[in-house]
Amino acid sequence: PLDDQMTGSSFLPQLVASDSGRIDARRDHTILGKERHDIGRTDGELLSVAYPSRALRNDQYLYIRNFESHRWPVGNPEYGLLNCDGSPTKTFLTNLTHDPAEKKWYDMSFGKRPKEQLFDMQNDPDCVEDLAGDPALAETVNKLWLQLKTELKAQGDPRVLGEGEIFDVRECFRLRVRP
């Protein structure tokens, strides 16, 4: 039996099935979430704050909701984008000029994100073209946000219950190792 603290449903039927493809028709999407804290991201007087996002991925779309879109997703540039380890690629991207032709590559990697993002995974699997602002897809964006919000509320996610600040003000507990 599952522990009372655990949520969700068993994935075992999919693992032991002799068929391939979608085994359970109810499993037609995935919910993802992230609360990433970084010593290089601030928000006013708050230090080491989260970059919270939640997403819903179905057969066609990836919908992302960035709850604090005014924050830098990879950490503040003035602190060295600390949520991205040093590498030749990071060095190359951070040395690009502010010329619009080059700036887009920096922004795709380190720039601020809009509140909502939508990618067509069948036609743009690399998630390069954000379609959230396309008026022709406004109904799709609204439908996906409603589905995501409904499921997050059912799970008790503080970000959709108006209690998201709990992630930014909660005390951080550190392990102490005795010699």
PLM feature segments, named:
Residues 99-116, 121-179:
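Long, internal low-complexity/basic segments
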Residues 1-117:
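C-terminal cap/loop subdomain of S1 sulfatases and analogous C-terminal strand-loop tails that border
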